[in-house]
Amino acid sequence: MEIAKAVGEWSKDPSTKIGAVAVGSKGQILAQGYNGFARGILDTEERYNDRPTKYKYIVHAEQNLIYNATYNGVSLDGSTLYVTGLPVCSECAKGVIQVGIRRVYMPKDFDIKGWSESWELSASMFKEADVYYEFI
């Protein structure tokens, strides 16, 4: 989890710094991601400070991790995901399930305000797809 926190610090988002790390069966880091803009997109302070604009450009840490693994030809099947800041949203949960991540660890000290509906759907999908999750 500490490595995921460090990766989150790479985000240029002044208000939210989320990090994600996928770990293989031998403890090796397979991929990492943080909330930020896509490759080649200017991540200017103005875009981050205008929330409606930011939300159009931002890639969640979990999505970024999946894209980075794909870009580098790394399979995440059977891996473990560590994510900081917030629980996995329902959009990211679909990607987590689809690439074969089997375990998800999230921080227990987060503010669920505004995220409860999305998290409830994520939890439901994780249970149905037999993805283990835990707040640590």
What are the language-model segments listed below?
Residues 1-136:
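Zinc-dependent deaminase catalytic domain
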